[in-house]
Amino acid sequence: MFFTIYHSGVRSRRGKEFVAALFVLFGLIWLAKSVGNIGLLILGIALGVVFHYFSFGFAGFWRQAILERKTIGMRSHLLLLAIGAVLFFPSLALLPNLGFEVSGAIRPLGLNVLIGAFVFGVGMTLVGSCSSGTLRQMGALNWRFYYVFLWMIIGGTVAAAQMDFWLELPTLGTFSAAIDIPWYFGLLMHLAVILGLYYLLLQWERSEFDSVEPLCNKENRLFLSPLVLAALLLAILNYLILLVSQYPWAISWIFPKLGILGIQALSLPIDWEFWEFVGQNEVALSKGVLDDSIMLTSLGMVIGVSLAFWGQVFLYGKEKSEISESKSFCGGCEQIKSLALTAITGALMGYGAVIAFGCNVGGFFSGIISGSLHGWLWMFSALLGMTLTLFVGRQFRSTKAPA
Protein backbone atom coordinates (compact mmCIF):
# COMPACT_ATOMS: atom_id res chain seq x y z
CA MET A 1 0.00 0.00 0.00
CA PHE A 2 1.27 3.45 -0.85
CA PHE A 3 0.97 6.61 1.19
CA THR A 4 1.78 9.65 -0.90
CA ILE A 5 2.14 13.35 -0.09
CA TYR A 6 0.78 15.66 -2.77
CA HIS A 7 1.34 19.33 -3.43
CA SER A 8 -1.81 21.46 -3.91
CA GLY A 9 -2.70 22.90 -7.29
CA VAL A 10 -1.94 26.44 -8.30
CA ARG A 11 -5.61 27.51 -8.27
CA SER A 12 -6.01 26.88 -4.56
CA ARG A 13 -2.56 28.18 -3.62
CA ARG A 14 -3.53 31.61 -2.30
CA GLY A 15 -6.49 30.28 -0.37
CA LYS A 16 -4.38 27.65 1.31
CA GLU A 17 -1.67 30.19 2.08
CA PHE A 18 -4.28 32.36 3.81
CA VAL A 19 -5.62 29.41 5.81
CA ALA A 20 -2.07 28.39 6.76
CA ALA A 21 -1.30 31.94 7.90
CA LEU A 22 -4.44 32.00 10.08
CA PHE A 23 -3.57 28.60 11.51
CA VAL A 24 -0.07 29.76 12.41
CA LEU A 25 -1.39 33.00 13.92
CA PHE A 26 -3.94 31.25 16.14
CA GLY A 27 -1.38 28.62 17.07
CA LEU A 28 1.12 31.25 18.18
CA ILE A 29 -1.55 33.06 20.21
CA TRP A 30 -2.46 29.79 21.94
CA LEU A 31 1.20 29.02 22.64
CA ALA A 32 1.80 32.50 24.04
CA LYS A 33 -0.99 31.91 26.57
CA SER A 34 0.02 28.33 27.39
CA VAL A 35 3.80 28.24 27.72
CA GLY A 36 5.54 28.61 31.06
CA ASN A 37 8.25 30.92 29.72
CA ILE A 38 7.39 32.83 26.56
CA GLY A 39 10.95 34.20 26.43
CA LEU A 40 12.44 30.75 25.84
CA LEU A 41 9.90 30.03 23.13
CA ILE A 42 10.82 33.29 21.39
CA LEU A 43 14.53 32.48 21.66
CA GLY A 44 13.86 29.06 20.15
CA ILE A 45 11.94 30.69 17.30
CA ALA A 46 14.89 33.02 16.71
CA LEU A 47 17.23 30.01 16.58
CA GLY A 48 15.06 28.39 13.94
CA VAL A 49 14.94 31.54 11.83
CA VAL A 50 18.74 31.91 11.97
CA PHE A 51 19.38 28.26 11.10
CA HIS A 52 17.01 28.33 8.13
CA TYR A 53 17.75 31.81 6.78
CA PHE A 54 21.53 31.35 6.83
CA SER A 55 21.42 27.62 5.96
CA PHE A 56 23.56 26.98 9.03
CA GLY A 57 24.20 23.48 10.28
CA PHE A 58 26.66 21.05 11.77
CA ALA A 59 26.57 17.63 10.09
CA GLY A 60 26.62 18.98 6.53
CA PHE A 61 29.58 21.27 7.23
CA TRP A 62 31.55 18.42 8.79
CA ARG A 63 30.82 16.12 5.86
CA GLN A 64 31.82 18.86 3.42
CA ALA A 65 35.16 19.36 5.16
CA ILE A 66 35.94 15.64 5.29
CA LEU A 67 34.90 14.67 1.76
CA GLU A 68 35.51 17.85 -0.24
CA ARG A 69 38.08 19.66 1.93
CA LYS A 70 35.87 22.75 1.90
CA THR A 71 36.23 24.05 5.42
CA ILE A 72 34.33 27.34 5.52
CA GLY A 73 31.49 25.68 7.44
CA MET A 74 33.77 24.18 10.08
CA ARG A 75 35.68 27.44 10.33
CA SER A 76 32.39 29.17 11.08
CA HIS A 77 31.92 26.60 13.86
CA LEU A 78 35.26 27.63 15.35
CA LEU A 79 34.16 31.26 15.19
CA LEU A 80 30.95 30.24 16.94
CA LEU A 81 32.97 28.56 19.69
CA ALA A 82 35.21 31.61 20.06
CA ILE A 83 32.37 34.13 20.33
CA GLY A 84 30.41 31.85 22.64
CA ALA A 85 33.38 31.41 24.97
CA VAL A 86 33.93 35.18 25.19
CA LEU A 87 30.34 35.46 26.44
CA PHE A 88 30.20 32.32 28.60
CA PHE A 89 33.57 32.16 30.39
CA PRO A 90 33.30 35.40 32.41
CA SER A 91 29.59 34.87 33.00
CA LEU A 92 29.96 31.34 34.39
CA ALA A 93 32.81 32.49 36.62
CA LEU A 94 31.43 35.81 37.87
CA LEU A 95 27.62 35.80 37.75
CA PRO A 96 27.13 33.20 40.54
CA ASN A 97 29.10 35.46 42.89
CA LEU A 98 26.71 38.29 42.03
CA GLY A 99 23.63 36.27 42.90
CA PHE A 100 22.76 35.04 39.40
CA GLU A 101 22.35 31.28 39.23
CA VAL A 102 23.83 30.05 35.95
CA SER A 103 25.43 26.70 35.19
CA GLY A 104 27.42 25.61 32.17
CA ALA A 105 27.11 22.37 30.22
CA ILE A 106 29.90 20.79 32.27
CA ARG A 107 29.99 17.00 32.39
CA PRO A 108 32.52 14.30 33.38
CA LEU A 109 35.18 13.27 30.92
CA GLY A 110 34.40 9.58 30.56
CA LEU A 111 34.16 6.59 28.28
CA ASN A 112 30.43 7.16 27.93
CA VAL A 113 31.15 10.45 26.14
CA LEU A 114 33.75 8.82 23.90
CA ILE A 115 31.46 5.95 22.90
CA GLY A 116 28.22 7.92 22.79
CA ALA A 117 29.60 10.69 20.60
CA PHE A 118 31.13 8.12 18.25
CA VAL A 119 27.77 6.34 17.94
CA PHE A 120 26.06 9.68 17.36
CA GLY A 121 28.62 10.53 14.65
CA VAL A 122 27.88 7.25 12.87
CA GLY A 123 24.12 7.82 13.00
CA MET A 124 24.47 11.46 12.02
CA THR A 125 26.44 10.49 8.92
CA LEU A 126 23.93 7.88 7.78
CA VAL A 127 20.88 10.06 8.45
CA GLY A 128 22.52 13.14 6.96
CA SER A 129 21.59 15.41 9.85
CA CYS A 130 22.18 16.04 13.56
CA SER A 131 19.62 16.86 16.26
CA SER A 132 19.33 20.54 15.39
CA GLY A 133 19.30 19.64 11.71
CA THR A 134 16.46 17.20 12.34
CA LEU A 135 14.41 19.93 14.02
CA ARG A 136 15.22 22.22 11.11
CA GLN A 137 14.04 19.65 8.58
CA MET A 138 10.88 19.09 10.60
CA GLY A 139 10.18 22.81 10.51
CA ALA A 140 10.63 22.75 6.73
CA LEU A 141 8.09 19.90 6.55
CA ASN A 142 10.52 17.24 5.41
CA TRP A 143 8.38 14.30 6.49
CA ARG A 144 11.26 11.82 6.58
CA PHE A 145 12.72 13.59 9.59
CA TYR A 146 9.55 13.22 11.63
CA TYR A 147 10.23 9.51 11.33
CA VAL A 148 13.88 10.09 12.26
CA PHE A 149 12.76 12.12 15.28
CA LEU A 150 10.48 9.30 16.44
CA TRP A 151 13.37 6.87 16.45
CA MET A 152 15.64 9.36 18.17
CA ILE A 153 13.05 9.42 20.96
CA ILE A 154 13.04 5.61 21.09
CA GLY A 155 16.84 5.42 21.13
CA GLY A 156 17.13 8.12 23.78
CA THR A 157 14.56 6.40 25.97
CA VAL A 158 16.40 3.07 25.77
CA ALA A 159 19.61 4.91 26.68
CA ALA A 160 17.84 6.41 29.70
CA ALA A 161 16.92 2.91 30.89
CA GLN A 162 20.57 1.83 30.65
CA MET A 163 22.21 5.02 31.89
CA ASP A 164 23.37 3.49 35.16
CA PHE A 165 25.63 1.14 33.18
CA TRP A 166 27.21 3.99 31.22
CA LEU A 167 27.76 6.12 34.30
CA GLU A 168 29.70 3.27 35.96
CA LEU A 169 32.35 3.34 33.21
CA PRO A 170 35.73 4.95 34.04
CA THR A 171 35.73 8.74 34.18
CA LEU A 172 38.26 11.48 34.86
CA GLY A 173 35.70 13.76 36.47
CA THR A 174 34.71 17.24 35.37
CA PHE A 175 36.95 20.13 34.39
CA SER A 176 35.96 23.51 33.02
CA ALA A 177 38.48 26.09 31.90
CA ALA A 178 35.87 28.72 32.76
CA ILE A 179 35.48 27.95 36.46
CA ASP A 180 38.24 25.55 37.60
CA ILE A 181 41.03 28.00 36.73
CA PRO A 182 40.94 31.80 36.43
CA TRP A 183 38.48 32.39 33.61
CA TYR A 184 40.76 34.78 31.70
CA PHE A 185 43.55 32.20 31.58
CA GLY A 186 41.04 29.60 30.49
CA LEU A 187 39.68 31.90 27.80
CA LEU A 188 43.17 32.59 26.43
CA MET A 189 43.87 28.85 26.29
CA HIS A 190 40.52 28.26 24.61
CA LEU A 191 41.11 30.92 21.95
CA ALA A 192 44.63 29.59 21.34
CA VAL A 193 43.22 26.12 20.64
CA ILE A 194 40.59 27.64 18.34
CA LEU A 195 43.28 29.54 16.46
CA GLY A 196 45.38 26.40 16.06
CA LEU A 197 42.44 24.40 14.73
CA TYR A 198 41.52 27.25 12.38
CA TYR A 199 45.05 27.15 10.95
CA LEU A 200 44.85 23.37 10.47
CA LEU A 201 41.55 23.73 8.60
CA LEU A 202 43.09 26.37 6.33
CA GLN A 203 45.97 24.03 5.54
CA TRP A 204 43.54 21.16 4.93
CA GLU A 205 41.64 23.22 2.34
CA ARG A 206 44.82 24.60 0.74
CA SER A 207 46.04 21.05 0.15
CA GLU A 208 43.15 20.62 -2.31
CA PHE A 209 42.48 24.12 -3.67
CA ASP A 210 44.64 27.00 -4.82
CA SER A 211 42.65 29.47 -2.74
CA VAL A 212 40.59 29.26 0.44
CA GLU A 213 37.03 30.54 0.60
CA PRO A 214 37.22 33.39 3.13
CA LEU A 215 34.87 34.18 5.98
CA CYS A 216 35.58 37.86 5.26
CA ASN A 217 34.45 38.69 1.73
CA LYS A 218 35.08 42.11 0.21
CA GLU A 219 32.34 41.54 -2.36
CA ASN A 220 29.75 41.41 0.41
CA ARG A 221 28.34 44.71 1.64
CA LEU A 222 29.17 43.76 5.22
CA PHE A 223 32.58 42.34 4.18
CA LEU A 224 31.57 39.13 5.94
CA SER A 225 30.28 35.72 4.94
CA PRO A 226 26.67 35.15 6.05
CA LEU A 227 28.04 32.31 8.17
CA VAL A 228 29.87 34.86 10.33
CA LEU A 229 26.64 36.66 11.10
CA ALA A 230 24.94 33.33 11.77
CA ALA A 231 27.69 32.34 14.22
CA LEU A 232 27.41 35.69 16.01
CA LEU A 233 23.63 35.45 16.32
CA LEU A 234 23.68 31.82 17.51
CA ALA A 235 26.29 32.59 20.17
CA ILE A 236 24.23 35.53 21.43
CA LEU A 237 21.02 33.48 21.43
CA ASN A 238 22.68 30.67 23.38
CA TYR A 239 23.92 33.24 25.89
CA LEU A 240 20.41 34.65 26.26
CA ILE A 241 19.10 31.12 26.85
CA LEU A 242 21.71 30.78 29.61
CA LEU A 243 20.50 33.99 31.26
CA VAL A 244 16.81 33.14 30.96
CA SER A 245 16.88 29.42 31.87
CA GLN A 246 20.16 29.37 33.88
CA TYR A 247 21.47 26.66 31.56
CA PRO A 248 22.86 26.68 28.00
CA TRP A 249 21.00 25.56 24.92
CA ALA A 250 20.41 21.81 24.70
CA ILE A 251 18.24 19.45 22.68
CA SER A 252 18.97 15.79 23.34
CA TRP A 253 17.23 15.56 26.72
CA ILE A 254 13.87 15.92 24.99
CA PHE A 255 14.28 12.39 23.59
CA PRO A 256 14.00 10.47 26.88
CA LYS A 257 11.59 13.09 28.23
CA LEU A 258 9.12 12.51 25.40
CA GLY A 259 9.71 8.76 25.57
CA ILE A 260 8.97 8.65 29.29
CA LEU A 261 5.88 10.81 28.84
CA GLY A 262 4.73 8.34 26.21
CA ILE A 263 5.36 5.40 28.53
CA GLN A 264 3.48 7.17 31.31
CA ALA A 265 0.56 7.70 28.96
CA LEU A 266 0.50 3.91 28.54
CA SER A 267 0.59 3.48 32.35
CA LEU A 268 3.90 1.59 32.35
CA PRO A 269 6.09 1.76 35.51
CA ILE A 270 9.23 3.90 35.38
CA ASP A 271 12.10 3.78 37.85
CA TRP A 272 15.23 4.57 35.89
CA GLU A 273 18.65 5.66 37.06
CA PHE A 274 18.88 8.25 34.30
CA TRP A 275 16.43 10.63 35.95
CA GLU A 276 18.15 10.26 39.32
CA PHE A 277 21.46 11.14 37.66
CA VAL A 278 20.28 14.45 36.24
CA GLY A 279 18.56 15.28 39.51
CA GLN A 280 15.31 15.97 37.74
CA ASN A 281 13.26 12.87 38.40
CA GLU A 282 10.17 14.30 39.99
CA VAL A 283 10.59 17.85 38.68
CA ALA A 284 11.25 16.91 35.05
CA LEU A 285 8.45 14.36 34.85
CA SER A 286 5.96 16.65 36.57
CA LYS A 287 6.64 19.50 34.14
CA GLY A 288 4.37 19.77 31.17
CA VAL A 289 5.78 19.94 27.67
CA LEU A 290 5.16 23.68 27.54
CA ASP A 291 6.81 24.26 30.93
CA ASP A 292 10.10 22.51 30.18
CA SER A 293 12.87 24.88 29.07
CA ILE A 294 14.54 22.44 26.66
CA MET A 295 11.20 21.45 25.18
CA LEU A 296 10.29 25.11 24.68
CA THR A 297 13.47 26.04 22.82
CA SER A 298 13.20 22.90 20.67
CA LEU A 299 9.56 23.57 19.85
CA GLY A 300 10.41 27.20 19.19
CA MET A 301 13.15 26.18 16.77
CA VAL A 302 10.72 24.08 14.72
CA ILE A 303 8.26 27.00 14.67
CA GLY A 304 11.02 29.45 13.72
CA VAL A 305 12.13 27.31 10.79
CA SER A 306 8.50 26.98 9.68
CA LEU A 307 7.98 30.75 9.84
CA ALA A 308 11.16 31.39 7.86
CA PHE A 309 10.29 28.65 5.38
CA TRP A 310 6.73 29.84 4.72
CA GLY A 311 7.93 33.44 4.70
CA GLN A 312 10.13 32.54 1.75
CA VAL A 313 7.19 30.80 0.09
CA PHE A 314 4.95 33.86 0.47
CA LEU A 315 7.65 36.31 -0.62
CA TYR A 316 9.28 34.39 -3.44
CA GLY A 317 6.74 31.69 -4.30
CA LYS A 318 9.34 28.96 -3.96
CA GLU A 319 9.01 25.77 -1.99
CA LYS A 320 11.59 23.13 -1.33
CA SER A 321 11.52 20.00 -3.41
CA GLU A 322 10.62 17.80 -0.48
CA ILE A 323 7.26 19.54 -0.26
CA SER A 324 6.52 20.37 -3.88
CA GLU A 325 7.31 16.92 -5.24
CA SER A 326 5.14 13.84 -4.90
CA LYS A 327 6.86 11.36 -2.61
CA SER A 328 6.12 7.76 -1.78
CA PHE A 329 6.29 7.21 1.95
CA CYS A 330 6.24 3.44 1.89
CA GLY A 331 6.28 0.96 -0.91
CA GLY A 332 8.55 -1.66 -2.40
CA CYS A 333 11.77 -3.21 -1.12
CA GLU A 334 13.89 -0.08 -1.47
CA GLN A 335 11.45 1.98 0.58
CA ILE A 336 11.31 -0.70 3.27
CA LYS A 337 15.11 -0.85 3.40
CA SER A 338 15.25 2.93 3.64
CA LEU A 339 12.72 2.98 6.48
CA ALA A 340 14.63 0.27 8.35
CA LEU A 341 17.98 2.04 7.91
CA THR A 342 16.47 5.36 8.96
CA ALA A 343 14.98 3.74 12.07
CA ILE A 344 18.31 2.20 13.08
CA THR A 345 20.35 5.34 12.47
CA GLY A 346 17.79 7.58 14.17
CA ALA A 347 17.86 5.29 17.21
CA LEU A 348 21.67 5.39 17.18
CA MET A 349 21.61 9.18 17.26
CA GLY A 350 19.13 9.31 20.13
CA TYR A 351 21.00 6.65 22.09
CA GLY A 352 24.43 8.17 21.52
CA ALA A 353 23.30 11.70 22.35
CA VAL A 354 21.85 10.69 25.72
CA ILE A 355 24.78 8.60 26.95
CA ALA A 356 27.26 11.28 25.75
CA PHE A 357 25.45 14.10 27.62
CA GLY A 358 24.33 15.81 24.44
CA CYS A 359 24.38 16.19 20.68
CA ASN A 360 26.03 18.81 18.45
CA VAL A 361 24.24 21.47 20.47
CA GLY A 362 24.46 20.37 24.12
CA GLY A 363 27.62 18.27 23.88
CA PHE A 364 29.62 20.14 21.25
CA PHE A 365 28.48 23.78 21.14
CA SER A 366 27.29 24.41 24.71
CA GLY A 367 29.83 22.02 26.22
CA ILE A 368 32.87 23.63 24.62
CA ILE A 369 31.83 27.25 25.24
CA SER A 370 31.25 26.27 28.89
CA GLY A 371 34.94 25.37 29.01
CA SER A 372 34.19 21.69 29.64
CA LEU A 373 36.78 19.21 28.43
CA HIS A 374 34.05 16.70 27.68
CA GLY A 375 32.89 19.00 24.86
CA TRP A 376 36.22 18.65 23.08
CA LEU A 377 36.17 14.88 23.57
CA TRP A 378 32.64 14.84 22.16
CA MET A 379 33.74 16.76 19.07
CA PHE A 380 36.75 14.60 18.21
CA SER A 381 34.87 11.35 18.89
CA ALA A 382 31.88 12.37 16.76
CA LEU A 383 34.24 13.47 13.97
CA LEU A 384 35.97 10.10 14.19
CA GLY A 385 32.62 8.33 13.92
CA MET A 386 31.66 10.38 10.88
CA THR A 387 35.06 9.96 9.19
CA LEU A 388 35.12 6.18 9.61
CA THR A 389 31.53 5.86 8.42
CA LEU A 390 32.25 7.92 5.31
CA PHE A 391 35.41 5.87 4.63
CA VAL A 392 33.60 2.54 5.01
CA GLY A 393 30.76 3.81 2.83
CA ARG A 394 33.19 4.85 0.11
CA GLN A 395 34.97 1.49 0.23
CA PHE A 396 31.65 -0.35 0.07
CA ARG A 397 30.50 1.65 -2.96
CA SER A 398 33.81 1.11 -4.74
CA THR A 399 33.57 -2.68 -4.30
CA LYS A 400 30.04 -2.68 -5.74
CA ALA A 401 30.96 -0.48 -8.70
CA PRO A 402 31.33 -2.33 -12.03
CA ALA A 403 34.87 -2.90 -13.23
Task: Indicate where each model-derived feature is located.
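Membrane-interfacial helix-loop segments of redox and metal-homeostasis proteins
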Residues: 1-403
